[in-house]
Amino acid sequence: MLTDPSARLAAMPKALRDYALIADGERGILVGPHGEHAWLCFPRWDSEPAFAGLLGGPGGYDVRPVCDRFVWGGYYEDHGLIWHSRWVTGEGAIVECREALARPALADRAVVLRRCRAVRGGARLRALLDVRPGGARMRDLHHRDPYWTARAGGARIRWRGAGEAVVREGADGGAVLAVTFDLAEGESRDLVLEIAAESAGEPPADLDPGALWEATERDWRAAVPSCDDTAAPRDARLAYGVLTGLTSAAGGMAAAATTALPERADEGRNFDYRYAWIRDQCLAGHAVAAHGGPPHVLRSAVGFVTARLLADGDRLRPAYTVAGGAVPGQRPSALPGYPGATAVTGNRASAQWQLDAVGESLLLLATAAEHDRAEPGAREAARVAADAIARRWHEPGAGIWETEDRLWTHSRLICAAGLRQAARVLGGPADAAAWTSLADAILAETTRTALTPGGRWRRAADDDRVDAALLIPPLRGALPAGDPRSAATLEAVRAELVQEGFVYRYRVGDEPLGVAEGAFTLCGFVLALAEHRAGDTARALRTFERARSGSATSGLFSEEYDVRQRQLRGNIPQAFVHALLLETASRLAD
């Protein structure tokens, strides 16, 4: 095995705004500006990474021009997560690499499609491949035209389109497959990589790039509508792509593709979001229902949430694996981590009680029933959820922001909203009466304990601060339109939590906004929805556009936006942000 300095994968992590995502529902890849596939967990979202460069670990798949100087750009196609990396070289050539994870996907097999094309002028490119599931090195490398084959950990590897590749020694002594090739103007080359679990059945006889691209394009066209009827068609299409790309065939939707990306440097606020949060999945279902597009995301959300309610009842967990399993508790990872954070896996939410997740579940079931998307067990699941609220709404819980246990106002109000909507469309006369009565009792008690003398909602009975999450329950029907408590809370959010047009979720201590944490992108879209509901469409559009400005160059959103540095913070892409963008874009066009 030859040592070759050029056989070094891109090692320096990039700013989060420079990454794009390709995904097939079971897993996703972060694509960096130098053609690096910096993050891929295999076989599913919460598995060990096979490409771990994002967090300083081994493994990756790079395709980039061979030249001293080039600048990067990129864009998504109109339908789905098909990404084009684009480079302009110092010699004046323009090169593109069209990239996707093949769809429809299989749970135990990932197929990575890359089509390199010289758009203008000739170009030389280099591809480097190092598949490292769980850190295991590639072994048993063989070439039998048209494939290179190898094994790594518990995975089998096939690589087509790189017949002239050679085995080189990588940075840590492991094997790297390296190939350099030339493209004349207008010429293209397909690279097809298959990573399959050892337990997978016999592989397809042929990894035909043309057929794989055609199937992938067809699948994405069916999943992503034009969205020309929204206030932001391009971003709405991307939101459909993100929500679809994060949703497993098992029904669960990963909250984000990544783990442990810091919200603030070296402050311990870096979490693993590769799991399916009940709340986030409900928000995604609402968004698709609001737009009325292809029902895949809504149908998956309803099926997943219904099954979890019927299985766990009043012990509903806030988050599950995408297959419905238990989320492990947070623990350190062996990876070095993204700069400013130590790597972790698992999530502490697995041990929390979050009342609002039950209320959101009722809202989702009611929305599905209104759109004829209810599961056979939906009515029973609604009864289970309502009973859980009746038994546990007096108990402290972690709440939407997953902090300390309290009687959070948002949690109670969102349950009142869920009960009212379920009573309207899911309950028989007896259930409807009981659920409405419970909603009235919750609202009365919350008004008694959580309304400030000025008439707005406080975060909790023992916390007078305003919270942007308190704008959500009125949007879902917890209170009638025009209710003065909602109006006062909206004004307080504008006065206390908005700076330079960006919205923060709440004030942290006595620090100015933007010091302890970034603007919370979700809250920007929530404020726009609240302003629209209040009849102030012009202001809602301004808020919507400001929130949209906090995206990556690819159009993806993370959880937070650092306004001062114009940087993304936290895991990416954050599903619930894209869900609220889609819902807001749909409602603003009404």
Each language-model region and where it sits:
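Acidic, mature catalytic/reactive cores of soluble proteins
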Residues: 1-590
